[in-house]
Amino acid sequence: MITADDLNGIMAMMPAFTTADGNRPDATATIDSDELARAVNKLIGDSGVNVLTTTGSFGEFHTLLWEEHKSLIEATVAAVKKRVPLFVGCTNLNPREAIRQAKFAQETGADGVLLGVPFYYQATVDNAVQFYRDVADALPKMGVMIYHNPTHHRVTIPVGAFKKITEKPNIVAMKDSHRTPLQFVELCNITKGKMSIFVNQTQMFPYYQLGAAGCWSFNVWMGPSPVINLLGACIARDWETAKRICLDLDGVGKVGPNIGNLSWRENVFKLAVNEAGYCTAGPLRAPWRVIPQEVTDNSKKIAAYWKELCEKYPLQKDRARKSA
């Protein structure tokens, strides 16, 4: 079984690659398996990302049919070929469905499952903790990564709760970006050796110094080199360079007007992936069929800004994987 020691570096959050007609509300087979395989192979083979995850918010778990989700799992497992750890997102409205989907991912060959709490009704902290313990018991040989997203899932898991969560040895990681530095230090003191904590790419300075295993990023699908250089700087303890890159990465959210609508927060970046040209994520799925012009404009600005960062921080092949 995968452990926290196996998880570090850059965690790429994958889009659910869409066929050209995948934005139709009557479409039933919208996974572009060919482009998925090409993009995954390029990202792993050329850049040195260390972990791959699917079907989070950016990964569009909320717009897929279960049949499509299964196709995506199968295509991703086949593309990754065990070169890096693969965690399949199975966040759902109820624990039984999440566990059913996670079992399929495990049987298909995924190393772990990425899970947010069931979110239709706001969970209590006690029930959020119990949810992860129940999943760990149901999947004792599968790694569990907590997808901590209070904005979408409407519950913040307090640091102290991880004393109980880490009693389960197969809860091995967390995607997070919602802790103050002091909270993060306390979190790492509790989870050290048991869970790898991945922070947002813009938090690598100073959180890597405080105990983060690495960072998560969906911007890498526009070209991974800025994030690879950031990880390399952190590993080398070149904090001035790390600080500078983090500031540049933070600028990606400031190149256009703040749209102020949560539904476009991840969707605009999928459109930006298409504009950047590193790979083709495809169109947005229904219900995102009416796209405001400001969202389209923002996606173009984001892509142009990111391409400038890729020129500023060119790829140094395999630096991240060999050093992480």
What are these regions, as identified by a protein language model?
Residues S47-G48, G109, P169, G211, ...:
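Glycine-centered loop/turn motif at secondary-structure junctions
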Residues G9-T19, K42-V49, P226-A324:
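C-terminal alpha-helical cap/extension of soluble enzyme domains
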Residues I2-R154, W288-R289, Y313-P314:
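Active-site beta->alpha loop and helix N-cap motifs at the rims of alpha/beta catalytic domains
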Residues L36, I73, A98, Y132, ...:
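A general structural signal for well-ordered alpha-helical segments in protein cores
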